[in-house]
Every structure is written in C-alpha cells, then in structure tokens.
C-alpha cells in the first residue's frame, strides 16, 4: 500500500473538495489515461486494487504511472464506541481527488488493451472516471 514516510500532522480535518483540478489534469507520461470526473477520496487500498487490476490485464507489456498519492490520514473510532472523547485513531491514508485529475496512465501497449485495462481499474474506484487519450496520437 502507498503511505507517506513522514507527515506534519497525525490527524487532519476532513475538509471539503471544491472546484476543478488545476494540477495533474493532462496526460503527461503515457499515451492513455484515466481521469476523474467527480470529487472523492481514494484510499491506498483502492489505488492498489485498481493498479493490480490493470497490471493483470496488460500482463508483462507496457508501463503504468500512478498519478495520485495518498498523503492524507483517515481516522476511525473503534466499533461500539460512544461518540465524544476525541477524534479516532488514524487507520489509513487517502488521496483527495477533484474532477479533471488524471489518476493512472499507460504506455507501451495497444490502445484497445489499455482501454480495457483502464475500464477494469475504474470499476475498483469510488469516483466516476473517463478514459482520455493524449493529444497527437
């Protein structure tokens, strides 16, 4: 799973995602990518599950780039605990995603194979996505 080595704060406020992605909104490394069209949070487990689904489909060919990194802690209280008495303990990491953000990119395989791999990855994610092809291909 992806996780940061060091963070400034152990617990963050949840916050609210507004607006469109300004950074990471174009296909930069690969030929084809998976772009989010909805706000949401991707946990490190979801990012990894989508990566595995892609890699199993493209087998040994091609290269995959993961363009998001889970750097925000997610907290949870234990089950059957009453509310109050502070914020829960950190249980994992998530990456906040805005519409327009490219999540994954693939290069080195045919576009049809890459499309199918990205579709399989999209089924593992909690946000709606579209497949985008880099201009000039």
Curated annotation (Swiss-Prot):
Pfam families xref list: Ribosomal_L16
Keywords carried by this UniProt record: Ribonucleoprotein, Ribosomal protein, RNA-binding, rRNA-binding, tRNA-binding
Coiled coil regions, renumbered to chain: none
GO cellular component entries: cytosolic large ribosomal subunit
Function, as annotated: Binds 23S rRNA and is also seen to make contacts with the A and possibly P site tRNAs.
Subunit annotation: Part of the 50S ribosomal subunit.
Record family assignment: Belongs to the universal ribosomal protein uL16 family.
Organism: Desulfovibrio desulfuricans (strain ATCC 27774 / DSM 6949 / MB)
Any one GO MF annotation of this record: structural constituent of ribosome
Name of the protein in question: Large ribosomal subunit protein uL16
């Amino acid at each position: 799973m992806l996780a940061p080595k060091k963070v400034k704060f152990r617990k963050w406020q949840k916050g609210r995602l507004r607006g469109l992605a300004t950074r990471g909104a174009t296909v930069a490394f690969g030929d084809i990518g998976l772009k989010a069209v909805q706000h949401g949070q991707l946990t490190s487990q979801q990012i990894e599950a989508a990566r595995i689904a892609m890699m199993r489909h493209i087998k040994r060919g091609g290269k995959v780039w993961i363009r998001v990194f889970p750097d925000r802690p997610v907290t949870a209280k234990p089950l059957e605990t009453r509310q109050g008495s502070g914020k829960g303990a950190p249980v994992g990491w998530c990456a906040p995603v805005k519409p327009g953000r490219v999540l994954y990119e693939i290069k080195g395989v045919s576009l049809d194979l890459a499309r199918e791999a990205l579709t399989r990855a999209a089924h593992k994610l909690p946000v709606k996505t579209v497949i985008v092809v880099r201009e000039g291909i």
